[in-house]
């Protein structure tokens, strides 16, 4: 089966009477045009998107196939993240946090309750933890790409 476009969001579609299958797309795969995946029901799926996916991405709830019997949607699994918060009186350190994370080309998201979220790796955790007035905590979380701050999300390292 070949899926070549995003048909909409699962929560906005009427899927009654149809089986919903999910294909897992990791956060770092979301902006790739070509995938070969297996749904949670064992169906092999080829995904070949146009160039719009390079900036839009594939995310939780995106429907990539639908017929009268089955709907296939994207599932973005939780991943290790760093939740960053600023201690009282150190709100001005937000600019430094954003600069340092951006300088490493890492994705950055708004979190809950005045926090920021970025992808976990040990060098990033060490760097963020050294910034005065900043608390960093490692967690497992689903990324909400509607809350991304970064202009582009990609897996680029220096």
What do these predicted ranges mean?
Residues 2-20, 41, 114-158:
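Helix-rich terminal scaffold detector
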Residues 55-58, 64:
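Short, well-ordered loop/turn sites that connect or cap secondary structure elements
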Residues 98-111:
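Residues forming anionic-ligand binding surfaces in small-molecule and nucleic-acid pockets
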Residues 58, 86-101:
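Short amphipathic alpha-helix segments
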Residues 74-87:
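Short glycine-/aliphatic-rich beta-strand segments at the starts of folded cytosolic domains
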Residues 1-54:
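Intrinsically disordered, low-complexity, positively charged segments
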Residues 36, 84, 115-119:
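Generic recognition of long tandem-repeat/solenoid scaffolds
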């Amino acid at each position: 089966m070949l899926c070549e476009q995003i048909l909409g969001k699962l929560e906005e579609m009427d899927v009654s009477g149809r089986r919903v299958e999910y294909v897992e797309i990791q956060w770092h795969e979301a902006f790739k045009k070509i995938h070969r995946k297996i749904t949670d029901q064992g169906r092999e799926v080829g995904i070949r998107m146009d160039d719009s996916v390079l900036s839009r991405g594939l995310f939780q709830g995106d429907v990539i196939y639908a017929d009268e019997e089955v709907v296939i949607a994207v599932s973005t699994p939780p991943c290790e993240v760093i939740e960053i918060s600023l201690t009282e009186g150190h709100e001005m350190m937000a600019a430094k946090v954003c600069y340092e994370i951006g300088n490493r080309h890492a994705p950055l998201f708004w979190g809950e309750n005045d926090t920021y979220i970025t992808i976990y790796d040990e060098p990033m955790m060490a760097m963020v933890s050294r910034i005065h007035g900043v608390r960093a905590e490692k967690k497992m979380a689903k990324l909400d790409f509607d809350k991304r701050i970064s202009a582009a999300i990609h897996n680029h390292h220096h």
